[in-house]
Amino acid sequence: MHLSDRFTSGIVPIMAVSVLALYIGLVLYMAIEAWPALIYMSWTDIVTGTEWKPMAQSPVLGLSYIISASLYVSLLSLIWALPLGIGTSVGLSLGVSPRIRQFCLSTIDMIAGIPSVIVGFIGLAVMVPAVQSMFSLSTGESILSASLVLAFMILPYIVTHCTESIETYRQRYEETALGLGISPWHTMKAIVLPSAKGSIILSSVLAFSRAMGETM
């Protein structure tokens, strides 16, 4: 065995164990820190409670409004982002050359890497005033503004996953469909998109999870 192979076979298990130990330590730390609250209030009271006053003389830790608001905003952001993401994926698959498609996907991946804090700041500086002005509201800090900013954040995930899946199925069926005289657009609508349904659902779940993580 070469020295490099020996080094790799020795370092990989150590790194894997280190990551696992870090994860276990994080879970234990959170459990230890949360234990006083779990003793003070039951799980039912925490999940169904409507008040959040952790610093009061008699602390109240109700999460129902926080959970419901997170679900609502995340679902609304998915409603905005999913049709646009699928449409963009179809356009990238059928409407542009492979070189332009690769450039667009690289740009989208770069957008996905923008930190959430920066996206939130831009949303606060741009989206909130725009919503306030457009709908003549007293304030633009609303569920609509939050969902639109979240939709921008999760859109790259949807586009990337859907494009990869759609392109895979398109290459698989396109030649046969053209041989049968079926147009590319009809092939996309009748064959490719139904075949990629599972991947589209998976990308939706991942995007929804990302949105929930940001809102919580």
Which ranges hold each PLM region?
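Transmembrane alpha-helices
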Residues: 161-162, 184-216
